[in-house]
Amino acid sequence: MKYRDLRDFLALLEQRGELKRISLPIDPYLEMTEIADRTLRAGGPALLFENPKGYTMPVLCNLFGTPERVALGMGQESVNALRDVGKLLAFLKEPEPPKGFRDLLDKAPQFRQVLHMPTKRLNSAPCQEQIWQGEDVDLGRIPIMHCWPGDAAPLITWGLTVTRGPHKERQNLGIYRQQVLGKNKVIMRWLSHRGGALDFQEWTQQNPGQRFPVAVALGADPATILAAVTPVPDTLSEYAFAGLLRGSKTKVVKCASCDLDVPASAEIVLEGYLETGETATEGPYGDHTGYYNETDSFPVFTITHITQRRDALYHSTYTGRPPDEPAVMGEALNEVFVPILQKQFPEIVDFYLPPEGCSYRLAVVTIKKQYAGHAKRVMMGVWSFLRQFMYTKFVIVCDDDINARNWKDVIWAMTTRMDPARDTVLMENTPIDYLDFASPVSGLGSKMGMDATNKWPGETQREWGTPIEMDRTVRARVDAIWDQLAILNNGHES
């Protein structure tokens, strides 16, 4: 499925009954969050607030509020099909040369997809139909949501931040929230290991005293938005991966004020710079943990230009205790992670990040165990292989007879196959999300691995338990007469 832009995607959603237009005036201050939260928890549609109180620009919320809409945005008809996206990423991360002519034919579709990776730069674009600069720059024209009562200020949540480090051809796209400070200033909240922060750090080292160009695109096409939250290899641009998802080259246009490329079909683009040493205290904000986070200092983004479509809409979301939109996206992207991990660790059968664990703080892994100590190797692999799992605090490893996505199965394995002292690994002073106030020091905390697999010789001196299982012939006989027994036909069937 190909979408030319966000509006093309919205047209499809509306056709499928997955978009609700709200004409009643709704306030961006708290009311939109409450409506979007109730809708998401009920598995409801994307929401287009057509008449935000005090504004003429519509607000789009809850766009990726179900895993199915995430899959549609990535060009797939089902969540299960996202495994194919993961296989493509695994191939791009570590491409294998064909072993022969037949293997070359098998890999041909993957090589053909690579043709969509280069971007196509346009001379003019819809995102630059209107240009505001200088004193005319005013974020007050945009209905930026104030999500929670204790939030410090309105917050831009769905901005695709475009950066490029010195001597790099690849542009980085990342989604970092931005607190509004004034009509032309926001705080750029990015963590130190994220691509934008690394680009800025390298820039300040090589260009001391010079301004760092930045652009923020709002309302890009779904492939570009989702590419920015997908674990693409560090050497691959999110624009290139968006082209793979879309099946056509990503169309970009040069910024009005700098050499950065932005999505040509974006609804709104903020252009400007970061000044070395100019920082501000960000927060507090209600976050994906379900709590207000601590305040901290981050760079200030000064906006020199705002470009937009003539009839632009503003794409927004909120974060809160799961489920929220990031948690739903994490649930869908879980399917992308599995093939990537399996490429490195073929023994992995399934991998699950429960939404209740903030989508990254706890992982359950099932494996085909092959030797004593195998579970501990997998724990270390999860923590080290992908940057996305740097902050995963708990990893539970089970055998492949356990359903990683069924807590009844997992808890049974933990309580029958684990000895707390022998089967628990604790590591201190490891990187932790600074938003995790449970850690003793900001940015540093511990991790726990739990080996809930059956123990092999060398891991235990005791005779291991044999699972109970009914005789197969007996089960077959009872299957044959089960309906005739009619035991559960009086309202007791579960």
UniProtKB/Swiss-Prot annotation:
Record's GO cellular component terms: cytosol; plasma membrane
Cofactor entry: prenylated FMN; Mn(2+)
Residues that hold prenylated FMN according to the record: I175, Y176, R177, R189, W190, L191, R194, G195
GO BP annotation list: ubiquinone biosynthetic process
Catalysed conversion reaction: a 4-hydroxy-3-(all-trans-polyprenyl)benzoate + H(+) = a 2-(all-trans-polyprenyl)phenol + CO2
Protein family (similarity comment): Belongs to the UbiD family.
Free-text comment on the cofactor: Binds 1 prenylated FMN per subunit.
Entry EC number(s): 4.1.1.98
Coiled coil: none
Lineage: Bacteria, Pseudomonadati, Pseudomonadota, Gammaproteobacteria, Enterobacterales
Descriptive protein name: 3-octaprenyl-4-hydroxybenzoate carboxy-lyase
Annotated function: Catalyzes the decarboxylation of 3-octaprenyl-4-hydroxy benzoate to 2-octaprenylphenol, an intermediate step in ubiquinone biosynthesis.
Keywords: Cell membrane, Decarboxylase, Flavoprotein, FMN, Lyase, Manganese, Membrane, Metal-binding, Ubiquinone biosynthesis
Annotated binding of Mn(2+), by residue: N172, E238
Membrane topology according to the record: Peripheral membrane protein
Underlying gene: ubiD
GO molecular function: 3-octaprenyl-4-hydroxybenzoate carboxy-lyase activity; metal ion binding
Annotated InterPro entries: UbiD (IPR002830), UbiD-like_C (IPR049381), UbiD-like_N (IPR049383), UbiD_bacteria (IPR023677), UbiD_Rift_dom (IPR048304)
Catalytic residues, chain numbering: D287 (proton donor)
Location relative to the cell: Cell membrane
Pathway given in the UniProt record: Cofactor biosynthesis; ubiquinone biosynthesis
Subunit structure: Homohexamer.
